[in-house]
Amino acid sequence: MKKKVQEIVNTVFVGDSRDVLKDYPDKCVDLCITSPPYWGLRDYGVDNQIGLELERDEYIGELVRVFDEVHRILKDDGTMFLNLGDSYSGSTGRSGGISEINSKARQLKTGAYKDLRPSKVDGVPPQSLMQIPSRVAIALQYSSGWIIRSKIIWSKTNPMPESVDNRPTKSHETIFFLSKIPTGYYYNQEAMSEPAKNPNSGDPWWQRKLYGEPSRHGLDGAAASGAGNFRTGELRNMRTVITLPTNSYKGAHFATFPPKLISPFIKGCSREGGIVLDPFMGSGTVAEVSKKLGRLYTGVELNKEYHKLINERTSQMEMFI
């Protein structure tokens, strides 16, 4: 029997999202923000968990099962922000996709790092980027008819180092913005806006230093600090590249979604009092930020130890509202 809406709000269920979401009522959530487990990099000690599939396409198929359910329980004017990591075929270490969110944030006693991927993947040359995010997005188009409205790049200013000497270090993550309908979904453009860059100001100091300027000599105060790069009070439509550092939570020993990354998504794509879903809740950042912004949250997490952390984060946050 399907649960009632009041039974899912401000609740994180311990279990497998493929099973738990089946009990959610149709069209009950307004927004989904999530980051699924990496393929083959984590073992939580639970049979048939997502991420331990022997084949890449099987992994993609299991994610499709989850997001078919998300499509069903999302309201017609709802949307989803899906953060996905990639892998290299034949590699034997972290591949640098959702490094902070999955290589760290999903590391507890039952989830220590392991590379469980096969050394070869059919149809993919060794050491090739497998394009898993794009493959998943395309599969979602054909399964439930998800509409890919945008591909957002989160450019990290503090990426995890990689021991590679034959390719650039991965310093970004992919976030797909998807909807159920082509137009008419809820989207508050003002809430999704960002400060407008001032073309008349100089490059900020860090950019000058990056491209060879050795000092701040000759720069005015605004240019030296970078503050002059934005017009006070003027906004522009959000760009598809978001530059932010990773974030850490004082109650955990890992990095998480930066609240600044997902706050505009929650404010811009859900109304106050709306329900925000995360079927792979992890450390609970989506729940915490949703509650702080006056939304309800709901979600699923496989690891029982994370459930304790999520409850701690949301209860501590209440003291500051």
What residue ranges belong to the model's regions?
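Core catalytic lobe of class I
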Residues: 2-319
